[in-house]
């Protein structure tokens, strides 16, 4: 643990988050805005803080995030993934708890592509028997 900052990249759907954690007071800044301003919904703030609550590291790190792409839910998931990877970079002993919670696994689910001859990915035109 020679370095003071720990960097990681998190991904979810179309969102990519570059996360830097620094030992501090627990302040989270996302795209130069406080987390309360960037994420209005409390559920999204809870998702971002999940890695800290699982590892019992609340209010021990300041988090600086650059995130782009996707919507707010995908961005929150990308930040969670990035924070989890940065915490493992900080202390390898945290890996089993984060792995058990599933925070280190990249969620590979993405939007299914639209097919031609259909309205959406799976929605088809109405079937007429006669």
Curated annotation (Swiss-Prot):
It holds the Pfam family Ribosomal_S9. One of its GO terms (molecular function) is RNA binding. GO terms for biological process: translation. PROSITE patterns: RIBOSOMAL_S9 (PS00360). Belongs to the universal ribosomal protein uS9 family. PANTHER family: RIBOSOMAL PROTEIN S9, SMALL RIBOSOMAL SUBUNIT PROTEIN US9M. This is Small ribosomal subunit protein uS9. It comes from Magnetococcus marinus (strain ATCC BAA-1437 / JCM 17883 / MC-1). The gene is rpsI.
């Amino acid at each position: 643990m020679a370095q003071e900052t720990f960097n990681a990249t998190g991904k979810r759907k179309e969102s990519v988050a570059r996360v830097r954690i620094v030992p501090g007071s627990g302040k989270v800044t996302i795209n130069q805005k406080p987390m309360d301003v960037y994420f209005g919904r409390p559920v999204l703030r809870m998702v971002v803080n999940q890695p800290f609550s699982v590892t019992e590291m609340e209010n021990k790190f300041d988090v600086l995030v650059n995130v782009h792409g996707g919507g707010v839910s995908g961005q929150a998931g990308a930040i969670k993934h990035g924070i989890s990877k940065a915490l493992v970079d900080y202390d390898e002993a945290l890996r089993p708890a984060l792995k058990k919670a599933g925070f280190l696994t990249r969620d590979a689910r993405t939007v299914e592509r639209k097919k031609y001859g259909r309205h959406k990915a799976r929605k088809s035109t109405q079937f007429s028997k006669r």
